[in-house]
């Protein structure tokens, strides 16, 4: 994720006299030399965007070096990864019986360790590009390093899902706070609309949880899955439309919410029930409407960005065909696959 962050640090100043002739320019240059293109406080710093606050230049009195130091608050454009993030393009650089190593082609520089398993070890080849999901609490930003490190695995369609129990209505103020995430989704949907429709169908079908025969049609324009995979008693709601109605107090968020496997992962759809009849493996999570919607919206963003990145990375039929072994590994993990 790309974001703005604010940091605090203390800089050592070798030549305080020269430094103070043009503090802002020297300070910005020093910050860029030390932090840009490196890891710092759980982020990878892309650019220094501003100096928010600085102290005077203090002279060190513990020795006779004549050096100084300055406390600084600055803002920076950063990139950072979170647990369970999806990365569409990780190039395999090493694969042996002990470990698989990959480098992300899309995010900040990061080396990803893929724990070796029999299936993944036998399939992934050096030089191939694989989609990866990061593991829980697996991203490490060691200060001063020029790349982060993480652990993950080749991303396989998930069979499990969470159910959320909302017992208080979403307020207009909370709905307004969610519009930033809604805007990101709409931007990603706009970007998606400009991509090759055949590619979108290929990857949506690949990451649909159920195994789909080649003659089953996907109506991606209305996010409708193959016949027989729908929850016949329920009609999904568009989360974006729901939140726009919430701004006008025209919708109720009470009840049980979920995004079960019959929905396309990147669809802006969810199911809402008065009584919980979802066939989930875990008990419902009791939470506020705001927390639930933030969770759903971020999941939709993650998958939409993932699908867009897949289309951009595997942008021709030859490249897709060169990775048929990866697609087969993914296909074999679906519900209903004939082993």
Curated annotation (Swiss-Prot):
Example of a GO biological process term: viral transcription
Keywords, in A-Z order: DNA-directed RNA polymerase, Early protein, Host cytoplasm, Transcription, Viral transcription, Virion
GO cellular component term of the entry, any: DNA-directed RNA polymerase complex
UniProt key word Transcription: yes
Expression induction or repression: Expressed in the early phase of the viral replicative cycle.
Locations listed in the record: Host cytoplasm; Virion
Function comment: Component of the DNA-directed RNA polymerase (RNAP) that catalyzes the transcription in the cytoplasm of viral DNA into RNA using the four ribonucleoside triphosphates as substrates.
Quaternary data: Part of the viral DNA-directed RNA polymerase that consists of 8 polII-like subunits (RPB1, RPB2, RPB3, RPB5, RPB6, RPB7, RPB9, RPB10), a capping enzyme and a termination factor.
Domain characteristics, as noted in the entry: Contains an extended C-terminus, with no homology to characterized proteins.
Similarity remark: Belongs to the asfivirus D339L family.
Designated name of the protein: DNA-directed RNA polymerase RPB7 homolog
């Amino acid at each position: 994720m790309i974001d703005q962050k604010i940091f605090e640090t203390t800089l050592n100043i070798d030549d305080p006299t020269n430094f103070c002739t043009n503090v802002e320019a020297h300070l910005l240059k020093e910050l860029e030399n030390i932090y840009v293109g490196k890891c710092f406080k759980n982020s990878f710093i892309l650019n220094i965007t501003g100096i928010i606050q600085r102290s005077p230049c203090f002279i060190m009195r513990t020795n006779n070096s004549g050096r100084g130091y300055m406390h600084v608050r600055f803002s920076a454009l950063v990139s950072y990864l979170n647990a369970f993030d999806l990365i569409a393009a990780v190039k395999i650089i090493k694969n042996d019986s002990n470990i698989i190593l990959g480098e992300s082609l899309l995010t900040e520089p990061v080396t990803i360790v893929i724990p070796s398993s029999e299936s993944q070890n036998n399939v992934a080849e050096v030089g191939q590009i694989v989609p990866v999901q990061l593991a829980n609490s697996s991203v490490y930003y060691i200060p001063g390093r020029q790349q982060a490190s993480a652990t993950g695995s080749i991303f396989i369609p998930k069979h499990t899902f969470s159910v959320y129990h909302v017992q208080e209505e979403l307020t207009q103020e909370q709905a307004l706070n969610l519009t930033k995430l809604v805007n990101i989704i709409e931007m990603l949907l706009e970007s998606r609309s400009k991509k090759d429709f055949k590619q979108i169908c290929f990857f949506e079908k690949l990451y649909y949880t159920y195994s789909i025969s080649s003659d089953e049609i996907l109506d991606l324009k209305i996010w409708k899955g193959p016949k027989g995979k729908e929850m016949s008693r329920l009609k999904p709601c568009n989360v974006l439309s729901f939140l726009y109605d919430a701004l006008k107090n025209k919708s109720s968020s009470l009840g049980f919410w979920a995004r079960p496997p019959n929905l396309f992962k990147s669809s802006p759809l969810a199911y809402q029930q008065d009584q919980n009849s979802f066939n989930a493996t875990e008990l419902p999570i009791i939470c506020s409407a705001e927390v639930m919607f933030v969770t759903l919206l971020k999941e939709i963003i993650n998958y939409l960005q993932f699908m867009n990145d897949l289309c951009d990375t595997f942008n021709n039929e030859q490249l897709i065909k060169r990775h048929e072994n990866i697609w087969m590994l993914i296909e074999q993990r679906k519900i209903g696959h004939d082993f």
